[in-house]
Amino acid sequence: MGIDKNEWGFRVGHLPHGERNKISDVPGVTVGHCTLADGDIQTGVTALLPHPGDVFHDKVLAACHVINGFGKTTGLVQIDELGTLETPILFTNTLSVGTVETALVKYMLERNPDICETTGSVNPVVCECNDCGLNDIRGLHVTEAHVAAALADCKADFAEGAVGAGRGMRCHGLKGGIGSASRLVELDGKSYTIGALVLSNHATFDDLIVAGTPIHELLEARIPPHEDKGSIITVLATDIPLSERQLRRLCHRALVGLSRTGSACGNGSGEIVLAFTTANRMPHYSDKALLPMEMLHDDAINPLFRAVAECVEESVLSSLLHAETVTGYHGRTVQCLSDL
């Protein structure tokens, strides 16, 4: 979905985007939501499947980068050490990480009877942001059934905005949530895709920049001052054959896209980035000690850096533009950008 120039009057960057302009333009990547929207309860779960197969036995190469570590995402230590992702990536609110992780472990155990029997454990990845402003987060309303529903909902054409884990999130003082975009890159005469998905819950209204324009200069009186705290989770996906080292380099460039929208990465804001490639797989079992692997030459990586910057910038703005105004906990209301 991303940003439609005909609808919003501007476009981000100049690289072409994929058919949907979402992370799901990377073949095999799907996203699903379970949204809880009932009075004081404004929260949910979002799930991302790296590919339609068995991710535990057919792992994807992955990397992560912590820009500012005010966050509780699980699974990063092992990704940083081994360079692989072996479960779906789940997103939820901060206090529901435990419940969601338990549900994800059960999901993996049901599909992989060898885990902790004839092989080792599993590394569940659960990302979070704090939605306590709009959501009764202390009520712990997310259940394992909601996780199962989000996983079952995974598809290529998914919703953005105030849905799933993004239901109660606030971005730049406005209604944020889930945003996504993609870019196409040509290498050796073949087209490849880089996609981004964000869970936006960070930054201040005074810092918001849209298409190079500081928005507070136009609408300053409409949003009360607030601290730069919250978090933003960014996931990058690609079908380009990259090494774990190169994926980490892509993670580092996410900050370029965040800064273009005005993010200053405040003390209380957790900026976490994960990246994976569907091109290079790591089998859980192998009868060979040496595995063949294709890899991009570093001299050809600059277009990928630009693609990441454009995808992340557009994903943040897409999370704002596709959100709706939400009233939640204690009657608090957070306006969406399109209502201003």
Which residues fall in each region the model found?
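Alpha/propeptide regions of enzymes that mature by internal proteolysis
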Residues: M1-L340
